[in-house]
Amino acid sequence: MADCIFCRIAAGTAKAEIVHETPAALAFLDAHPAARGHAMVIPRVHAASLLELEGAAVEGLFLAVKEVMAKVAAALRPAGMNVGWNHGRAAGQHVLHLHVHVLPRYAEGGRGVQRLGEGGDRGALAEVADALRRA
């Protein structure tokens, strides 16, 4: 997709600090890192979300995520890592090409994933669980 910056990075027509490549995916350092070594792993095919990827592409993407995590662990020795992605603009996805963040966390600056709420109402949880099971 010509107007997608991540597709241009994958095609080699836009610059990025590429740190890992596979036939299915590639990883590069985030241009606006939240921590030293913050990388993003993308599928080579354009997909705005995980729901758009076929099985083999999903497998290739997450194998690359694991390999990037191993590289980050070996090279930078963080105390931990956050790994995840934003799905859709309402969730904070700014580039509509699926990208998985590998975010090293260091003892002096790690915040982890912040808790979003308190315990849920058991009845409401059961209702949502039933709806998900039926879907």
Region spans (language model):
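HIT superfamily nucleotide-processing domains
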Residues: 1-135
